[in-house]
Amino acid sequence: MTASGDDRGRAEAPSELRRAGAPLSTDAIDSYVDAHTTPLEPLLQENREETYASLSSPQMIAGPVVGRLLRLLVSLAAPRLVLEIGTFTGYSALAMAGGLPPDGRIVTCELSPERAAFAQGYFDRSPWADRIDVRVGPALDTVEALDGPFDFVFIDADKDGYTGYYEAVVPKLSPRGVIAVDNTLNGGDVVDPVDERDRVMAAFNDHVHADERTENVLLSVRDGVTLIRLAG
């Protein structure tokens, strides 16, 4: 059976996009990925909707695909101690909390008292309220005060601080611990940096990749997620 003209057009669309140099993360592909990813609890959807409705820079939220990825990674790692740097409105902490083992807990760091209070309201309504500890203040101070070891770390905060956060947590990472870092593609602009944020993120990626203490993979999931563990 031969395909109709319309069918051929649909079949060739992805390759045509690639030949034209269009970015992979188109709206259509994003929608397809969303539709084929297991959704998280309704409370997280409510959190996301309220974040977009009431806060500035709502795009900083991790979102359902990265949230499900974090849930899966935490479920596989079965961490006793999770460290999150950058609570924002609590979406990613809630996503990770759902994958914790019975003895697992999360310490999440947020500089803004207002955002921390917003997130706490959702934590209190969740089944994991007693397992999420919000620390308000500079994240480096919190990391310094914690003994570790960290079994899972999620970094999604001020991009200028990424290298400092990385250096602070690597010595406190458990032997099988994993670090996940969000936004490491920075909209694709790390490939050919133009502004300061581009250069900061590109420098962070170079720093991690050159670090002989660790090994990493940069995944092209949404805005880029880098997974890191100790080498050897």
Tell where the protein language model's regions lie, with residue ranges.
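A short alpha-helical cap/connector motif
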Residues: 1-152, 159-180, 184-232
